[in-house]
Each structure stands twice: as C-alpha cells, then as structure tokens.
Amino acid sequence: MSIILGIDPGSRITGYGVVQQKGSKCIYIASGCIRTKGDTLAPKLDMIFNGISEIIKQYQPTEFGIEQVFMAKNPDSALKLGQARGAAIVAATQADLYVCEYSARQIKQAVSGSGGATKEQVQQMVMQILNLSGRPQADAADGLAVAICHAHTAQTIVAMSGKVSKTVRGRFR
C-alpha cells in the first residue's frame, strides 16, 4: 500500500493530488492547489516549497511524482516553471522521498489512453478512475493525474521486474 503525492507545478498555481494505491486501484485522499501571490518569483517559490512541505507532513506520502518541464513558446515561462518544479522537488527530497518525473504525454497516456488528450478528457478520466462525484479544479486534476500515472508506471515496473530478470539474450526462459 503506497500513498502517492502527484504535483503539477506552476509559478502561479501548483496543483497537487494524493492517492492511495491498493493493488491496481487508486483511492482518492486529497487534492488542491497552492496559489502564489505577488509579482516577484522568490516569495512564490517559498510558498510552493512551504505548501508542498505542509502537504507532505499532513498526508505522509511514500512516493512522489512530478510533471516534467515542457518547452513553452515563451522561454521565460519555461524557466519559471522549472524553478517552481525545483521548489517542489527540494521539499520532496528533504522529506526523503524519491522523485519520479513524467512528461505530459506519459501522464495523459496513463490516465486517458491517449498522449494527446485534452485537459477536459484528463479531468473526466481522473473522475472515473477515482470515482469522484464532482469535477476537480483543472490544476488539482492534473496533480491527481500525475499520482495516477506514477501508480500505473510503478506497478508496471514491479510486474516486469520478475520477467526481465528471467530473460536471456532477449528471450524469456
């Protein structure tokens, strides 16, 4: 049984989702957004770091997943996103959590079956997978999607580990 914290980083809004993995099922625990204020970046990064640290203390995750930076049209936006990710990653590593990173395409594929899924499709699938009665806010849904992606990816790696060790020159024994 694992508790997974998924993070969708952003310099203005960082979405998070906490799920418990029981076998092949994901059970909703919590989700929300860390909303930063102000015009300067340093206080925003501090809010992200402190917010993630507080979530870690409250929910005691055993695993941590975060979305990778994608190259936006605006390089300044990509740099700010990278710094927001850094603040979240430091909070995780200070809590002795191993950090796993996933591309937006991997996350969409794991949740919806399509790497090109829209935000609305991801939200809908998150609702179905976690059996939620209402639609989570977009950034929170993305955080939950990261956690679900991590759960599915980790499960696949564990399932394959026994088989991979039984191969010789690419063939199963």
From Swiss-Prot:
Catalytic activities: Endonucleolytic cleavage at a junction such as a reciprocal single-stranded crossover between two homologous DNA duplexes (Holliday junction)
Compartment(s) where it occurs, according to its Swiss-Prot or TrEMBL record: Cytoplasm
An annotated Gene Ontology molecular function: magnesium ion binding
The family this protein is said to belong to: Belongs to the RuvC family.
Classification via PANTHER family: CROSSOVER JUNCTION ENDODEOXYRIBONUCLEASE RUVC
HAMAP family on file: RuvC
UniProt protein name: Crossover junction endodeoxyribonuclease RuvC
Source organism of the structure: Psychromonas ingrahamii (strain DSM 17664 / CCUG 51855 / 37)
